[in-house]
């Protein structure tokens, strides 16, 4: 492979089209992400970070460009097709011909599994099916039929996908952990797995029976490219000896010399034994696989390379450089173009002849196209381009066009068709005119639905907004502005409703001023967690008295399951009451939620609240809605729902969950899970199921066949959540009724009595007949949990009704059907009448700057004033609001999603604390290991005895150690300034608690290691003392317990009134996720002068106790004991009145040694 030379063509920048003035303030990266040669014509396809796909000819002249992915979604993969090009984004797949005309475009709205995609490849040489894979474990590998434009197949695949390639009958899938799988697309099974690279696969190529890969390994906490390229022979399914990259290629930088590894690898398309190996430094080799010593080396002159591609003819190599310029190498002779089989001729536009017309054209000649009349050139600004401030107009609203008269028969026929074919009207679902003969019509601009029109949104600096979250002015005006919850105009969202982001300072989260966002005694929740959207739902149920009392009462019993939402939610609510307005976290609850497999299948493990199941899709698992047609018992339904029993497949057309948002699906899943866990807890007792009595809605499902056989079935189900939809979609009788002046009551009442006609196969006569299905609620539980699922058009109508979300109503059961009215006098019945009041609701907030998020409203009884007050919870911002503002949903940016109505008597019940119940303390006096008792366990503690039972005020010394599950997320500005976006995710690894008083003072009675089977990024051995294998239940010799066991021990000590002594207890308790009041903590960080640095435990022990601790790795028992001795020293210095003098001396001496002990200086 000699005689290669750099092309004479001048490099061309590929991102020139992204450097527009209107993107000047866009911080999104503007770069080329993917490059591919066309297999049939002389074109190069390039995708960028804004979803554009461009094609260039051999002279780098632009041929076509089109937007393949909407919403500035980056292009992650390109594939050449015989009819055009395939482009893959994170949540969409685009297929366009070479003239940039879209032939197929599917998104996650069409195929729900199309989420977080990273790679794709063809399933066969026919190129009719393409397989896509990504990082979403619930999606697996998605096969899309390019001919029919729909989902063809789904392959179950439990690993995150990095790269995909196909050849002959197999597909090669590279995982993100460096492993390689060979997949048979005919049987959808993995036929072989190879251990590719230790960390990741960076490049891969697959041709005939040869597979080559280049990857990276981790050394010294850094990723370095491997020096060798792996080669696999798939005829014998074995790995061949690896091929080394250029041994004499080195890279000089920062005064050091580094060996260059392989970053790119590609097989030659013509010569089957030749492979091209390249590096980001520009070096590339041609190597003969049959004789690796035969190689030709070249080096591309540039700073770095981001993409390398070999043309189908094998005569060109294209490079994309670090500055997004494209450059090319070629052979000096025998060149045939990019492809040697060019059979397709490129099409170019036809240019009209602008010559003199043969003759004048009559103005009445309708056959003459107006598009052929040219426009004159202009050198002044057109009126249509003038700024909106010149006219100050919102634009002209088109007048309504009267519809032609339509017969009642046609109307009823169209209505019946729409109602029977779907649970929603056709126009509401698609926005297209219906097929019942209705004419097209112009609709007026809906300001309530779309907000203000034709108004330029002023630029607002996000950097200044972040500064306001961290820095408070002397007069506090910045924070006062952020607490404003009333809108100043109808265009902007009030500051209190914006999506909040925690800003980390020098000392992490301790610098954040949470108190400025909450002046109440009700705690907010941090946003530094996964699934942050759940905060609003948890806050709503926190202030439902009976739900709170039941969950907290469950803490009296032992439950050591790590996936118990019942226990974690009770602990969270107990912590929020104990915090009394201070910030809390729901991290333990999120850990339990993530440990339930069904939460992934439902898409609940996400920070986005936009994804919802779409119609015409199939979902595995038993339905979770009130229209489940499985006919199973309550226990079987709950087990299928929360445990992930996927034996049944139900179409979304059979339930009402096809339009539920992620928060609504989480609401349904949460209540079903809590019901299931309570049922499991009381399965061998005669106790009643409390949550079923509170939330259980008895739904009677009656199905009858409108045919001569008259088949009839009836069953009953218990559901905890009612999905509220429009009356028009629930019953035919509401079709001709207007809802302009109706509150939510007709929506609820019609959702409690649904009637639908469908075409189905009769189970008795086996004929396709019209089946009438009626679902009726037979009871009125004390709590009504509602998922409000309306279309955009239905919300536009509801927002115009004042008081649509009514604060109270009266209900009764009459003739086995619920009736809801605003006044009790409107209920003409002698049956019992129940009064319901709105307890709270969750609303979606949409603004111009950030993605949608949730806030919660709760109605709380104030015992001091004996009145109810409304509070708004926006994560850690808590604000009291007036009732009128809380119930106002007319704003375009606020839409209710979940609401809960409580019986008026339930709402007045008090919140009972955990201390009211008789608590089981036995775990403090015994062991409960995660994997049973073992003789090899090394115990360094002595259990408490009944005589040593802690009392209020008893001193205990505590220290906790953690391991890192992920690294810090840091943002680096153009000036080199680093900003911590999200700190590293940690996991509790070890907890040691020592006696603080008595004859055994300083002797530990708890020294538990917490079992961890997840991936650990860093054991932090130097600071935690945890070695690899210490937390593995199969290899560890430590006393391993589950996370819930150690949390209960600490919680019990807190309940007993113990005083905790330690160093840096704030961070320990925050990461453990438990709140301990300040009066129960004694932190040795009190050795601190205001405005000066904090002193480490090691330096304090040396300066005050003359002890050299932490010589090797940290030991939590030693650290807890040292903190206990330091606290006693503090009390002694306070008693003598010399504490301030000694503290000043410590700071003065420490300044000379930079606060280090002599051992550290050496």
Curated annotation (Swiss-Prot):
GO biological process: mRNA processing; nuclear-transcribed mRNA poly(A) tail shortening; postreplication repair
Predominant localisation class: cytoplasm
Molecular function in Gene Ontology: metal ion binding; nucleic acid binding; poly(A)-specific ribonuclease activity
E.C. number: 3.1.13.4
Annotated a divalent metal cation binding sites: 959, 961, 1068, 1119
Any Gene Ontology CC annotation: P-body
Domain Exonuclease residue range list: 956-1126
Ranges of biased composition (kind: Polar residues): 424-437
Annotated stretches, region: Linker: 341-491
InterPro entries, per the entry: Exonuclease_RNaseT/DNA_pol3, PAN2, PAN2-PAN3_catalytic_subunit, PAN2_N, PAN2_UCH_dom, Papain-like_cys_pep_sf, RNaseH-like_sf, RNaseH_sf
UniProt key word Ligase: no
Intervals holding WD repeats: 27-66, 153-193, 196-233, 300-339
The keyword Repressor is annotated on this UniProt entry: no
Cofactor binding note: Binds 2 metal cations per subunit in the catalytic exonuclease domain.
Regulation of its activity: Positively regulated by the regulatory subunit PAN3.
Region annotation Disordered: where it falls in the sequence: 401-443
Localization, UniProt: Cytoplasm
SMART domains, A to Z: EXOIII, WD40
TM spans (from-to): none
The entry's keywords: Cytoplasm, Exonuclease, Hydrolase, Metal-binding, mRNA processing, Nuclease, Repeat, WD repeat
SUPFAM superfamilies membership: Cysteine proteinases, Ribonuclease H-like, WD40 repeat-like
Catalytic activity: Exonucleolytic cleavage of poly(A) to 5'-AMP
Functional summary from the UniProt entry: Catalytic subunit of the poly(A)-nuclease (PAN) deadenylation complex, one of two cytoplasmic mRNA deadenylases involved in mRNA turnover. PAN specifically shortens poly(A) tails of RNA and the activity is stimulated by poly(A)-binding protein PAB1. PAN deadenylation is followed by rapid degradation of the shortened mRNA tails by the CCR4-NOT complex. Deadenylated mRNAs are then degraded by two alternative mechanisms, namely exosome-mediated 3'-5' exonucleolytic degradation, or deadenylation-dependent mRNA decaping and subsequent 5'-3' exonucleolytic degradation by XRN1.
Summary of subunit composition and partner proteins: Forms a heterotrimer with an asymmetric homodimer of the regulatory subunit PAN3 to form the poly(A)-nuclease (PAN) deadenylation complex.
PANTHER family per the UniProt record, alphabetical: DEADENYLATION COMPLEX CATALYTIC SUBUNIT PAN2 (PTHR15728), PAN2-PAN3 DEADENYLATION COMPLEX CATALYTIC SUBUNIT PAN2 (PTHR15728:SF0)
Protein name (Swiss-Prot/TrEMBL): PAN2-PAN3 deadenylation complex catalytic subunit PAN2
Organism: Eremothecium gossypii (strain ATCC 10895 / CBS 109.51 / FGSC 9923 / NRRL Y-1056) (Yeast)
């Amino acid at each position: 492979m000699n005689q290669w030379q750099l092309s004479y063509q001048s490099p061309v920048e590929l991102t020139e089209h992204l450097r527009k003035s209107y993107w000047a303030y866009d911080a999104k990266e503007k770069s080329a992400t993917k490059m591919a040669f066309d297999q049939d014509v002389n074109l190069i396809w390039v995708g960028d970070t804004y979803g554009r796909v461009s094609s260039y000819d051999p002279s780098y002249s632009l041929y076509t460009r089109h937007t393949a992915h909407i919403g500035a979604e980056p292009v992650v993969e390109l594939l050449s097709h015989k009819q055009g090009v395939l482009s893959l984004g994170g949540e969409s797949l685009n297929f366009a011909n070479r003239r940039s005309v879209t032939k197929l475009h599917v998104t996650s709205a069409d195929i729900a599994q199309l989420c977080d995609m990273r790679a794709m490849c063809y399933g066969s040489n026919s190129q009719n099916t393409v397989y896509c894979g990504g990082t979403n474990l619930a999606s697996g590998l998605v096969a899309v039929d390019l001919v029919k434009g729909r989902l063809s197949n789904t392959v179950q695949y439990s690993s995150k996908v990095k790269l995909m390639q196909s050849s002959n009958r197999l597909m090669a899938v590279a995982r993100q952990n460096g492993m390689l799988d060979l997949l048979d697309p005919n049987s959808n099974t993995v036929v072989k797995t190879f251990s590719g690279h230790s960390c990741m696969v960076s490049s891969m190529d697959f041709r005939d029976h040869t597979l080559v890969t280049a990857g990276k390994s981790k050394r010294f906490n850094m990723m370095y490219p491997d020096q060798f390229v792996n080669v696999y022979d798939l005829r014998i399914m074995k790995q061949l000896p690896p091929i080394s990259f250029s041994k004499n290629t080195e890279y000089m930088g920062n005064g050091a010399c580094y060996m260059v590894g392989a970053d790119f690898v590609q097989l030659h398309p013509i010569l089957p034994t030749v492979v091209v190996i390249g590096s980001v430094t520009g070096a590339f080799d041609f190597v003969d696989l049959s004789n690796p010593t035969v190689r030709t080396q070249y080096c591309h002159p540039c700073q770095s390379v981001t993409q390398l591609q070999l043309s189908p003819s094998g005569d060109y190599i294209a490079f994309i450089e670090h500055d997004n310029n494209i450059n090319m190498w070629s052979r000096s002779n025998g060149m045939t173009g990019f492809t040697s089989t060019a059979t397709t001729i490129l099409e170019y536009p036809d240019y009209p002849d602008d010559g003199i017309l043969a003759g004048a054209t009559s103005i009445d000649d309708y056959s003459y196209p107006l598009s052929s009349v040219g426009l004159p050139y202009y050198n002044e600004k057109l009126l249509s381009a003038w700024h909106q401030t010149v006219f100050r107009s919102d634009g002209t609203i088109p007048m309504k066009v009267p519809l032609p008269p339509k017969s009642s028969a046609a109307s009823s026929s169209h209505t019946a068709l729409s109602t029977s074919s779907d649970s929603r009207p056709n126009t509401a679902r698609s926005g297209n005119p219906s097929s019942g003969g209705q004419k097209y019509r112009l609709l007026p601009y809906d300001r309530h639905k779309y907000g203000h029109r034709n108004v330029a949104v002023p630029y607002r600096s996000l950097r200044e907004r972040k500064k306001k979250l961290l820095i408070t002015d002397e007069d506090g005006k910045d924070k006062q502005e952020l607490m404003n919850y009333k809108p100043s105009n109808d265009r902007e969202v009030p500051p209190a409703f914006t999506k909040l982001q925690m800003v980390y300072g020098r000392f992490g989260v301790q610098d954040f001023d949470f108190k400025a966002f909450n002046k109440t005694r009700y705690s907010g929740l941090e946003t530094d967690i996964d699934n942050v959207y759940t905060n609003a739902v948890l806050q709503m149920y926190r202030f439902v008295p009976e739900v709170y009392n039941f969950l907290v009462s469950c803490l009296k019993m032992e439950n050591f399951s790590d996936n118990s939402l019942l226990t974690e939610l009770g602990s969270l609510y107990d912590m929020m009451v104990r915090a009394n307005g201070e910030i809390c976290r729901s991290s333990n609850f999120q850990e339990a939620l993530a440990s339930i497999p069904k939460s992934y299948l439902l898409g609940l493990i996400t920070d986005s609240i936009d994804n919802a199941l779409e119609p015409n899709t199939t979902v595995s698992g038993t339905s979770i809605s009130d229209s489940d047609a499985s006919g199973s018992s309550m226990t079987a339904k709950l087990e299928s729902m929360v445990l992930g029993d996927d034996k049944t497949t139900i179409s979304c057309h059979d339930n009402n969950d096809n339009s539920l948002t992620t928060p609504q699906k989480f609401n349904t899943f949460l209540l079903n899970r809590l019901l299931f866990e309570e049922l499991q807890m009381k399965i061998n007792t005669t106790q009643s199921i409390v949550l079923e009595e509170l939330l259980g809605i008895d739904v009677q499902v009656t199905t009858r066949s409108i045919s001569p056989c008259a088949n009839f079935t009836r069953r009953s189900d218990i559901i905890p959540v009612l999905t509220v939809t429009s009356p028009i979609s629930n019953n035919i009788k509401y079709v001709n009724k207007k809802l302009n002046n109706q509150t939510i009551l007709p929506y609820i009442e019609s959702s409690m009595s649904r009637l639908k006609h469908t075409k189905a196969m009769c189970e008795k006569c086996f004929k396709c007949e019209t089946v009438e299905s009626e679902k009726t609620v037979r009871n009125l539980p004390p709590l009504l949990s509602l998922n409000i699922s309306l279309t955009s058009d239905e919300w536009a109508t509801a927002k115009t009704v004042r008081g649509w979300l009514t604060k109270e109503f009266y209900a009764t059961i009459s003739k086995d059907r619920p009736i809801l009215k605003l006044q009790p006098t409107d209920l003409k019945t002698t049956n019992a009448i129940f009064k319901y009041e709105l307890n709270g609701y969750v609303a979606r907030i949409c603004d111009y700057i950030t993605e949608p998020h949730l806030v919660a409203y709760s109605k709380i009884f104030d015992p001091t004033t004996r009145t109810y007050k409304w509070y708004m919870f926006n994560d850690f911002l808590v604000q009291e609001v007036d009732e009128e503002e809380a119930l106002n949903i007319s704003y375009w940016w606020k839409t209710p999603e979940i609401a809960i109505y409580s019986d008026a008597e339930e709402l007045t019940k008090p919140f009972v604390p955990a201390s009211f119940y008789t608590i089981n303390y036995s775990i403090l006096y015994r062991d409960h290991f995660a994997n049973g008792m073992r003789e090899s366990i090394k115990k360094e503690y002595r259990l408490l005895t009944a005589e040593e039972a802690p009392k209020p005020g008893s001193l205990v010394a505590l220290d906790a150690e953690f391991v890192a599950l992920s690294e810090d997320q840091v943002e680096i500005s153009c000036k080199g300034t680093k900003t911590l976006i999200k700190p590293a995710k940690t996991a509790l690894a070890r907890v040691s608690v020592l006696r603080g008083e008595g004859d055994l003072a300083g002797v530990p009675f708890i020294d538990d290691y917490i079992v961890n089977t997840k991936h650990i990024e860093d054991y932090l051995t130097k600071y935690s003392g945890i070695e690899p294998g210490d937390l593995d239940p199969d290899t560890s010799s430590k006393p391993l317990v589950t996370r819930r066991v150690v949390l209960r021990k600490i919680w019990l000590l807190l309940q007993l009134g113990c005083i905790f002594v330690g160093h840096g207890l704030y961070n320990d308790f925050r990461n453990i996720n438990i709140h301990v009041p300040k009066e129960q903590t004694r932190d040795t960080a009190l050795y601190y002068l205001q405005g000066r640095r904090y002193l480490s435990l090691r330096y304090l022990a040396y300066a005050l106790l003359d002890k050299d601790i932490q010589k090797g790795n940290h030991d939590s028992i030693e650290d807890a004991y040292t903190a206990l001795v330091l606290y006693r020293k503090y009390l002694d210095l306070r008693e003598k009145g010399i504490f301030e003098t000694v503290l000043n001396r410590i700071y003065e001496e420490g300044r000379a040694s930079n606060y280090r002990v002599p051992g550290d200086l050496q």
